[in-house]
């Protein structure tokens, strides 16, 4: 799984594993349902075991991240923060899309719900500073009936942005609105 978590928009799929590309193709085109389900379970088990959730941004060793936490997202720090915010973005969104397709193809039992919840939580936790993953992750968790984890993801996303001293209300508003909807049972 060399680099599947590090795929970036525009040039990344060339460097992805064949399994990754197959999962993307099958999800987008809605084909090979049984093969997709089996391949996804195998792929996600391997991805999660070989790449712990903090392996992508190595938070404790990231000097730029530590500077941002100390100084906040002001001035040129926003420029330096972009690589942190975008880390894992493509793959996290693909994991959510794959999980959504898997959920639609599988029986809605406790085992499937637990497996899908595990994958969605992994997709978000790969980079908790990427607020663009939190809302679709929470949406899917709520749709499969896991409101508790959906709420936790949104609360973590808001706390992570506050940890970075991010003052951009465009970041907070969708997170807060989705959290309100989940708290009010409107999903």
Predicted regions and their residues:
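Oxidative protein folding and maturation machinery
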Residues: 1-187
């Amino acid at each position: 799984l060399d680099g599947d978590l590090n795929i970036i928009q525009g040039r990344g799929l060339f460097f992805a594993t064949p399994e990754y590309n197959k999962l993307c193709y099958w999800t987008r085109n809605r084909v090979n349902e049984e093969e997709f389900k089996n391949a996804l379970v195998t792929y996600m088990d391997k991805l999660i075991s070989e790449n712990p959730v903090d392996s992508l941004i190595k938070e404790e060793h990231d000097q730029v991240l530590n500077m941002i936490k100390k100084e906040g997202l002001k001035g040129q720090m926003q420029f330096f923060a972009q690589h942190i915010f975008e880390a894992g973005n493509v793959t996290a969104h693909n994991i959510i899309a794959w999980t959504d397709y898997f959920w639609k193809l599988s029986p809605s039992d406790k085992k499937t719900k637990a497996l899908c919840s595990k994958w969605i939580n992994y997709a978000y936790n790969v980079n908790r500073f990427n607020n663009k993953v939190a809302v679709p992750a929470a949406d899917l968790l709520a749709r499969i009936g896991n409101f508790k984890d959906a709420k936790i993801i949104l609360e973590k996303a808001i706390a992570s942005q506050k940890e970075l001293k991010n003052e951009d209300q465009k970041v907070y508003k969708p997170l807060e609105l989705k959290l309100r909807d989940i708290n009010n049972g409107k999903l």
